[in-house]
Each structure stands twice: as C-alpha cells, then as structure tokens.
C-alpha cells in the first residue's frame, strides 16, 4: 500500500477522483460554501452524522463530488486517539467495496500527532495476512492520499508515520506466520534480508557458537526441539562508531508448548505469537533503514522452540547462565526469561547507552493490564519516562509497574543462585526482577507485551506492537 501527502482543502478534495473520500470533521468545524461543506452541513442538520467521536456516515455517489463514496467521520476534539478511531471506523465501512484509491481529508489543519494517527489507522484497518493462503484475497486498498489544507512542514512527520507502518506490518507478517513457517532458521533469514538495506548488518550464531559463549540458559530451552537455535545480532550504524548504541532485545520463541510444564490445549496455537518481541525488533530495523536517523542501534534475538522431547529440560534442573549465575528451572514454561538473561549478558559487550528487552513474558501482565497497555519495568527513571512518553506520542501505550526488591524474595532457592519463577502473586513483577539480575551494567527497561502483541477471537492476529513505541523512543533520542 502506497501513502501520499497532498495539499488539498475541502474544495480540492471534492474534486479529487477516488474510490472513497474520508472527511475528518472535528466538533469545531464551520461549514463553508463549497460542495463538500454543504454536504456536511446537510448531514449535520438532518441528524444523520452522529456527534459522537468515531462515528461515520457513508454516502454513495454524492452530488457535486468526484468520489465514488464519501465517508463523513467525526473526530470529536481532533485528538490523535479520536482520529485513529474515526479513520478505522471509516476504512472498515468501505473496505469491502472495490476501494483502490482512498483519500483521507482533514477538514481543518491537524497537529502532527493526529496526522500520524490517520496513517497508522488506515494501514491497520486495511491489513490482510495472505502468506499461508492458497487463494488469498489480498489488500484491496492500494493507494492512500492524506490531504491537508497546507502540507508544508508535515513531510517529516508523514514520512515517520509511513516508516512506522512499514515496520509494524513487517512485524505482523512474521508474528502471524505459523510456527512451521517461522522457525528460528527462517527468522534468521528474515534478519539477513534486512542487511541488504542501508546501514544494517546482520550476524547469526548457531548452537556451537552459543555453546562457546556459555549461554547455558538459552541452550536449556532449545534442547527439546529438533529445530536448531539461532542467536541473531543486527546492527544499525547511523552515527559515529564512538556513539554508544541502544540495544533492543526481542524474545524469539517461535513456538512455546510450555515444555514439560505443558500448556493447556486451548488456544495453544496462539503460542506462535511468542516471538512477537523478536518480530518487533525486525520491524524497527526496517523502519530505521527507511528513515536513516543518526543513531546506533543493536538488535539481539535469541530464537528457538520450547518443546517436549526426551532431551527437554526438566523441572528442578539447574543450568549455568552466560553470566555465571546458576538457575534452578522450576517451571519450563517460564522459558522466555531464560533466553533473555543470556542475551542481556551478551549485550554488555556493546557498552550500551540503554537496553530495552521486549517479550511476551507473563500471563500475569495480561491479567494486570489487559490488551491496552504493555507492562514497563525499569529502575531508571529517565529511561522509563522516555518510553512512557514515546508510547503516549505513538498511541502505543505502556504502564510502569514496580520493581521493589522485596518482590525478589520468592526467587530464592536452596539449589541455585536463583529460581526461574516465584509464586503466582505479582508474576509479571517477579519475572522482571529475575531479568534485572542480569542487567546491572547498563540502563535497562523491560516491556512485557503478553497482552498487547496479538488479539484473540474473531480479530485474531498480531498487532505489530510495540514497533511504534520503540521507533518513537529511538527517533526522539536521536534529536
């Protein structure tokens, strides 16, 4: 899908030939004398256009307009969130038709955030996954024109939004793939493909190299699968070599059965989404290649499957992590923290300015925050504030949760330096406390995306989160 930015007022939008014209109307809108304004005024007077934000009215072949369909969408006060809801509703109202060219017109000049929201919402509402379908019905909308009365100064923010969409959809593509279409080796292939782009390099380590590094925790998770593990290292070099990089660490469990601590059968298919953290890292790197910001970023992806086998790690086994700390594995379904802890130790060699890990880590985080906000954990107030701000700006929200030392009491064990689980209470926090033990040499944050990485039910599928949050954080830090 191609996005374009054009300067069009309402009069110009009325003359634009397209399959659908979406007009975004704030409550402050004052109709003029052009054909489109007259149409809006008539709809308001008749009560056909609801005053509630996010509501849309579809008109077919409206008189005086060049479009095949006009959609009048209420954006309330015009905030980014209201624009996002309105655009999604409008696109959903027309996408079943043969809409190839779509024009989204702001009736009044927007702020930057609502314009970005319109781009990302149009992409989300029209997204279709087709990779594993024999006769796919692909995305109908091919061209989206975003129209404002004066586009001067909007090009940088527009390009940023389009790059974010590109990254989000790349993350969705890989997270949505079934596990047999997204093995660790195939995921590594996707990372290697990114190395063809500007400023990106990729290195992939296999089992022997990981063993030499002493990543005993990562290897313990992988040993129950016939699919060999991969440790993916991506580099985006946009600044001088002397500039300390930010490290993004994505959990890459391409399928999680739970191991011997096996998961219930219901919804186990959704465990293909357990590599959504890794997918988000890939998406961010694709967006970085498009935008070329002056920063350095490292992407780390420990990838493997967590399956049952005669060689699978057993509850009670003790393994030695790359840091030298020993871990008693009391629950083999708490495997994400095991692959992440070795990757956190590996991150030390880059002397990073910050490390952010992204993982579908705990069901406890889903219980705490649902599917609205990702869980954020960090002992660094500045880093936490920057990530929260990035989430607010990008509408990819997170919520900071505590990391009090008392929460780590449950991780104590008589048989190793630390256990991989505590009790049920505060499970998202105790998981973060486990990771914190391996992140003492750099500013660190943990994003638990177990509730936000995908949707279940009739809308089942990856969301591409938190690509937008991470990209916003990186671009802001580059200023």
Swiss-Prot record:
Q: Which residue ranges traverse the bilayer?
A: none
Q: Which GO terms describe its biological process?
A: proteolysis
Q: Which UniProt keywords apply?
A: Aminopeptidase, Cytoplasm, Hydrolase, Manganese, Metal-binding, Protease
Q: Which SUPFAM superfamilies match?
A: Macro domain-like, Zn-dependent exopeptidases
What EC number(s) is this enzyme filed under? 3.4.11.1, 3.4.11.10
| CC per GO annotation | cytoplasm
Enzyme class, spelled out: hydrolase
Q: GO MF annotations for this entry?
A: manganese ion binding; metalloaminopeptidase activity
Q: Where is the active site?
A: 263, 337
- Could you say which residues bind Mn(2+) 2 here? 251, 256, 274, 335
Q: Which residues bind Mn(2+) 1?
A: 256, 333, 335
Q: Which family does it belong to?
A: Belongs to the peptidase M17 family.
Enumerate the NCBIfam families for this protein: PRK00913.1-4
Q: Which HAMAP family match?
A: Cytosol_peptidase_M17 (MF_00181)
Q: Sum up the protein's function in the record's words.
A: Presumably involved in the processing and regular turnover of intracellular proteins. Catalyzes the removal of unsubstituted N-terminal amino acids from various peptides.
What name does the UniProt record give this protein? Probable cytosol aminopeptidase
Provide the organism lineage as a comma list: Bacteria, Pseudomonadati, Pseudomonadota, Betaproteobacteria, Burkholderiales
């Amino acid at each position: 899908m191609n996005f374009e930015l054009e300067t069009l007022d309402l009069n110009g939008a009325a003359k634009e030939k397209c399959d659908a014209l979406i007009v975004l109307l704030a409550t402050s809108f004052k109709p003029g004398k052009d054909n489109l304004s007259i149409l809006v005024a008539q709809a308001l007077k008749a009560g056909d256009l609801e005053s509630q934000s996010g509501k849309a009215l579809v008109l077919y072949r409206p008189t005086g307009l060049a479009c095949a369909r006009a959609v009048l969408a209420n954006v309330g006060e015009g905030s980014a969130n209201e624009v996002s809801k309105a655009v999604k509703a409008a696109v959903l109202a027309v996408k079943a038709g043969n809409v190839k060219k779509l024009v989204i017109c702001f009736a009044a000049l927007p702020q930057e955030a609502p314009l970005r929201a319109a781009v990302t919402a149009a992409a989300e509402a029209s997204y279709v996954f087709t990779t594993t379908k024999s006769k796919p019905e692909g995305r109908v909308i091919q061209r989206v024109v975003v129209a404002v009365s004066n586009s001067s100064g909007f090009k940088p923010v527009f390009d940023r939004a389009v790059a974010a969409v590109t990254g989000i959809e790349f993350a969705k593509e890989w997270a949505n793939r079934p596990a047999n279409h997204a093995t660790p080796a195939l995921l590594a292939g996707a990372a290697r493909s990114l190395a063809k782009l500007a400023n990106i390099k990729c290195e992939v380590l296999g089992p022997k190299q990981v063993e030499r590094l002493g990543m005993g925790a990562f290897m313990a998770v992988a040993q129950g699968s016939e699919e060999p593990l991969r440790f993916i290292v991506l580099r985006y070099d946009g600044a001088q070599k002397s500039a300390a990089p930010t490290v993004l660490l994505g959990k890459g469990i391409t399928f999680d059965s739970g191991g011997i601590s096996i998961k219930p059968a219901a919804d186990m298919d959704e465990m293909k989404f357990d590599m959504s953290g890794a997918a988000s890292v890939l998406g961010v790197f694709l967006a970085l290649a498009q935008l070329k910001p002056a920063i350095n970023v490292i992407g780390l992806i420990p990838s493997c499957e967590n399956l049952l086998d005669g060689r699978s790690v057993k509850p009670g086994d003790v393994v030695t992590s790359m840091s030298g700390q020993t871990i008693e594995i009391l629950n083999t379904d708490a495997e994400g923290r095991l692959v992440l802890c070795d990757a956190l130790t590996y991150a030390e060699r880059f002397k990073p300015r910050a490390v952010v890990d992204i993982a579908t880590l705990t069901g406890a985080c889903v219980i705490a925050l649902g599917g609205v906000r990702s869980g954020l954990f960090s002992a660094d107030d500045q880093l936490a504030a920057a990530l929260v701000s990035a989430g607010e700006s990008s509408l990819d929200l997170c919520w900071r949760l505590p990391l009090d030392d008392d929460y780590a009491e449950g991780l104590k064990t008589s048989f190793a330096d630390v256990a991989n689980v505590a009790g049920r209470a505060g499970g998202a926090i105790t998981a973060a406390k486990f990771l914190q033990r391996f992140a003492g040499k750099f500013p660190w944050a943990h994003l638990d995306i177990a509730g936000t990485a995908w949707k279940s039910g009739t809308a089942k599928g990856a969301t591409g989160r938190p690509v937008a949050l991470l990209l916003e954080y990186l671009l802001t830090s580059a200023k």
